[in-house]
């Protein structure tokens, strides 16, 4: 079984040319709208060109693409295979990224819009949760890519 998990949406109503989706995430206590206006990478590479990642200690992410597409790179040392590349579009469902997982995303050429129906834990501080970690300075993270 894969360590990468999705929460699927549920269609609860359809009319001519209209589909209503229930995209609820029961665990969620926060919602963020993340807009890439072009082919952005978040977080961007550092000043020497090394990949950077976010890692949350007090937040789980539940990312759903609502427009465009994103490629997520995930690194979690506790997984059987620590490194995953996930292609996410409007049909995949919600990608669950547990706290303690290094992650970054890249949009397609036209950008993308993601809703993150996050679960934030006591102690959450956006200044601490969104600090990029570089492969150039974190040897354990670097070693995931050179093996």
Question: Which residues does each predicted region cover?
Answer:
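Active-site region of the double-stranded beta-helix
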Residues: 1-90, 110-147
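Histidine-centered metal-chelating micro-motifs
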Residues: 92-105, 122-123
């Amino acid at each position: 079984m894969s360590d990468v998990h999705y929460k699927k949406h549920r269609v609860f109503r359809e009319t001519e040319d209209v589909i209503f989706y229930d995209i609820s995430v029961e665990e969620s206590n926060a919602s963020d709208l993340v807009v890439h206006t072009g082919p952005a990478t978040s977080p961007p590479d550092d000043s020497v060109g090394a990949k950077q990642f976010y890692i949350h200690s007090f937040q789980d992410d539940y990312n759903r693409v609502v427009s465009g597409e994103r490629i997520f790179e995930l690194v979690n040392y506790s997984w059987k295979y620590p490194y995953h590349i996930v292609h996410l579009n409007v049909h995949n469902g919600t990608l669950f990224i547990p706290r303690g997982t290094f992650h970054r995303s890249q949009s397609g050429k036209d950008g993308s819009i993601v809703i993150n129906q996050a679960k934030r834990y006591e102690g959450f501080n956006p200044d601490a949760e969104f600090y990029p970690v570089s492969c150039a300075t974190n040897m354990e993270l670097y070693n995931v890519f050179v093996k």
